[in-house]
Amino acid sequence: MTTTDQILALAAHPTATTEADAGLARFAEAAVAGMNTHVVRALRALRPADDGPAWRAWLSATAALSAPGGAAASGAVPSGAAPSGAAPGGAAPADGPVVTTVVCAAATALGEDCSAAVAAGLQAAALAEAGLATAAGWSVPVVSAAIGAGLAAGLMLGLGAAQLRSALGICATQAAGLRAAAGTDAAPLQAGKAAFNAIEAAQLARLGFTSSREPLDGRRAFFPLLSS
């Protein structure tokens, strides 16, 4: 079973978890605390009007990570793993601040009842992270969060298996983020953009956009590219 297949298996029976609920609570508090940071003000200056859920996810994730005392403020980009709720293949749900923020931002921008989608997204991010052990130079939390957030967004939009596969591929082809950005304004910005891209990918998949059937493990796909 490929990593993409393992992630899609998570979508079959998504279940709310205490880890997801706790992550959502932390995210909501941090997003409010960071909404007046200079990074968020700069983003708002580019698009002063509400520009849909993807834009709201970008703003909220950036706000949460640029809040005073947040992960970006300290220059940290940890990922970590929760001790319970293992995903297929043995990966525990990723619950580092960057991963959790990106997944929660994507899910909450699309609805309120999102604990199950967030739980599945955190597990998907952990599976993506496990394949990026040698991704030197890349911000592994950000690029793996893009995959997890894509699954969460797809679940919130009610996508079927084929559409979810396409959404994951669209996320993978746009995944980016540099370790060198840690401690700068670009760190929360690139994490927020991952949440934006995740929602956009799910929306495009719902409209019929396609992508690689094996966007993660394929010979010219996500893992080989980022680990080269």
Stretches with model-predicted labels:
Residues M1-S228:
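N-terminal core-entry segment
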